[in-house]
Amino acid sequence: MAKEWGYADHNGPDHWHELYPIAKGDNQSPIELHTKDIKHDPSLLPWTASYDPGSAKTILNNGKTCRVVFDDTYDRSMLRGGPLTAAYRLRQFHLHWGSSDDHGSEHTVDGVKYAAELHLVHWNSKYNSFATALKHPDGVAVVGIFLKIGREKGEFQLVLDALDKIKTKGKEAPFTNFNPSCLFPACRDYWTYHGSFTTPPCEECIVWLLLKEPITVSSDQMAKLRSLYSSAENEPPVPLVRNWRPPQPIKGRIVKASFK
């Protein structure tokens, strides 16, 4: 069996390029954001998300993260505007987190690591499938939201309450009637750049929209995320507590801000 990628020493981010050479490409994510080097681009528009809560389908534990999956067979839950020149369909969202509250995000802002990072993955509906979209530099748009420790977020609890049904790798449960825009911060200001998926195969097909304002979650809520296992039900238990990729070289890419 081929070696499976993961986050451990033997199969972690430093090894991904052995199986997926593009992981050492010129447009890899995440990156470190240095705000003094980022220019405001007045041509960047506001972005809008119109999500249909009925398009939420299931929540699953794939051994790498917890993921909420949406029906993307037609234009039900859409992302538009911002740096995007087309409408993008919501496919899934997932999270990255660390073993403690002081780290876990993949992108960093002026050296700051957040407790977690939420990724809402959308694909360009001008392509006929998600698989086709992956082959194009404008194929996918990801909205990234930082989670910092503070007050509990009630809307996030809806996701966390479902985790008991998907404790171990391979578990999936119904998860319906959920509008992920309830997880957005009040401020829609964003940074944008061209990058990649932060997990293998690390395809370089992503327009990133990273929201400047984090949302707050409680330390107890983060602990609930860490209660998941990366092991299957019949295997020795391995906690799912470190699933972030470190920042990658920016290699001359330009990051733009929608705000001054």
Swiss-Prot record:
One of its GO terms (biological process) is response to bacterium. The keyword GTP-binding does not apply. Zn(2+) binds at residues 94, 96, 119. Disulfide bonds: none annotated. Its cofactor is Zn(2+). Residues 3-259 form the Alpha-carbonic anhydrase domain. PROSITE patterns: ALPHA_CA_1, ALPHA_CA_2. Coiled coil: none annotated. Reversible hydration of carbon dioxide. This is Carbonic anhydrase 3. It comes from Sus scrofa (Pig). The lineage of its organism: Eukaryota, Metazoa, Chordata, Craniata, Vertebrata.
